[in-house]
Amino acid sequence: MPLHKYPPALWDVLKLKDGIYARLPEHYRRSLLEKHKPYPVHWKPHGLKYRLNPKSGQRERVQDVPILPYFPPQANKGLWGGEGWVTGYHYANNDKLSARVKKVWKPQLFKRELYSEILDKKFSITVTMRTLDLIDAAYGFDFYILKTPKEDLNSKVGMDFKRAMLMRLASKDSNLYPNDPSKRDQIYNKYKEFVIPMEEAEWVGLSLEEAVEKQRLLEKKDPTPLFKVYVEELVKQIETQTLAEPAIIGKKP
């Protein structure tokens, strides 16, 4: 007899079909269901299912076992480029005859100022050397944020940057360099491949809790004061009574 009515792997999918979750925008619910494997940072996949054993010459199966890093809460406040804490073991005093002790390898963090052309502002962000290399490879901070999928960014502040950039591009006429039309057109043409409608841009990067709260605020209606309700009812009653009464026409002398 199964322990659950539905397998746990389907819980996240079924949750989006009920209650306020079902009323979330379709594009946002679709983004939650789209899962992509992050780029391997701390390990190198073989890329093969089978290989020849160099000693026996027999074909043997190759198994890729990924190294899953731990991302502490402070990783959401910076751009670590997919790096995280890796837990393992090493020999004490670098001696194989010594005891094996636990060790945590952590990435080296730096504080750097990064400039965004779309937002026209500098930001002081905690980064790693790999992040800086990825920014250089993408030809700029904006391209790195817009091109990198959420699984590789793996940062709340990174997704906040992406949402702010997409919203700025979507509202080109009002917020994108309002005092410099030539600069506005130049920046817009440079990043126009990433332009999406404002209705989608404002939902990018929101967590499920934030999206639910946003949907509640959109559906929220302030209660109408009772005195307004009673005044409207009184006006309708007077209008109905006036129309029902016969008109009195006075006789001419």
Swiss-Prot record:
The keyword Mitochondrion applies. Transmembrane segments: none annotated. The gene is mrpl28. One of its GO terms (cellular component) is mitochondrial large ribosomal subunit. Residues 1-55 form a transit peptide. Belongs to the bacterial ribosomal protein bL28 family. It comes from Xenopus laevis. This is Large ribosomal subunit protein bL28m. Keywords: Mitochondrion, Ribonucleoprotein, Ribosomal protein, Transit peptide. It is found in: Mitochondrion. It holds the Pfam family Ribosomal_L28. PANTHER family: 39S RIBOSOMAL PROTEIN L28, MITOCHONDRIAL, LARGE RIBOSOMAL SUBUNIT PROTEIN BL28M. Component of the mitochondrial ribosome large subunit (39S) which comprises a 16S rRNA and about 50 distinct proteins. GO terms for molecular function: structural constituent of ribosome. Its main location: mitochondrion.
